[in-house]
Amino acid sequence: MEAEGVIVVRELDLKKDLLEVEDLERRCEVGNSGKISLFTDLHGDPISRVRHSPAFLMLVAETAKEKEIVGLIRGLRVSPSHRRMGIGLKLVRQMEKWFGENGAEYSYMATENDNLASVKLFTDKCGYSKFRTPSILVNPVFAHRLRLSSKVTVIILSPSDAESLYRKRFSTTEFFPRDIDSVLNNRLSLGTFLAVPRGSYSADTWAGSDRFLSDPPESWAVVSVWNCKEVFTLEVRGASLAARAFAKTTRIVDRALPFLKVPSVPELFSPFGGHFLYGLGGEGRSAGKMVKELCAHAHNLAKELGCGVVATEVSNREPLKSGIPHWKWLSCDEDLWCIKRLGEDYSDGSVGDWTKSPPGLSIFVDPREVKD
């Protein structure tokens, strides 16, 4: 625990802090009048987004006298009435201290590129440097199922096969989690799916990842699906009546005349859930087409489970990015990741200081760290 002036930073007490934390979240998420805002429902569990990590901590900042919670860090939130008082900085410093105590060599954060207050806090006051600008790609789930190509076979991999494939092909990708086995075996991971040309492999002829990698087809792609709906739901508020009416009309037409394949707007104006695609990769000239088929398969899975969107996050330089269907107005071209080296004595061997390394073609986004 840390006390500076009238603000105390301490660990969240889930039993006594729940209502105050929920109230703070609501006050921080109120959008500007007349503008569209995105609201998040954590289903009464403030640590739902971090509890699946091997180690996690959530801190709150409260006034020493009134015991009022005025800030928290999971995503960084500070009460509008207590901003510009250094509370965010105190929360970040205390979290970094915990990182160091747990052996972390680096700390990184993600924010929107246009969140100037957040960017300034981390880069100017906390010593972070702008590191990567990945793209968040979001596609709606339509009322109709998507048809997959008859030229492609989609195989469901076991967690052990998926782990073997990921470690042997993607372990050097930036942000690859060392405990990928824990990710794949988590109850929120709905499966890993491999797309191959029809006739090359099938569920009946599949002999494991080792055999596959020793004799791969000309092109293939892989992706895993994470169920964010069980962690949080979202809701778009502030949309005009005209926008709501248009969206409803597209859904009615899609359901009534599915053969028209109308790209309907999902019901985003009431709470909706989503699936997150992670571990996306592949090889070969037609890998992008394979990715497109996997995204269609993921769309149909999301439809079965009542989700409103399917999302992923990839490097801006990702070679397979063009194969990922998405709606531009739902997506974010440039998310911003900032990074800081916590200790000068740390080293990554021949790589050296990671904060100064050039970006690779791909990144591996840990689904446990997906922000609302």
Model-derived regions: residue spans:
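Amide-forming acyltransferase catalytic core, primarily the GNAT-like/NAT-type
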Residues: D17-R26, V30-M58, V119, T123-G273
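Residue-level recognition of the GNAT/N-acetyltransferase active site
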Residues: S79-S81, E112, G282-E283
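An N-terminus-focused feature that recognizes amino-terminal "leader" regions
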Residues: E2, V8-L72, R83, L89, ...
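Conserved active-site alpha-helix within GNAT-family acetyltransferase domains
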Residues: E101-G103, N113-S135, N316-W337
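Conserved GNAT acetyl-CoA-binding A-motif
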Residues: G71, F99-D114, P134, K303-N316
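C-terminal functional modules
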Residues: H299, K303, C307-D372
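Conserved acetyl-CoA-binding loop-helix of GNAT-fold acetyltransferases
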Residues: V78, R84-W98, D124, S286-N300
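A conserved beta-turn-beta hairpin within the catalytic core of GNAT-like acetyltransferases
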Residues: K67-I73, V265-L277
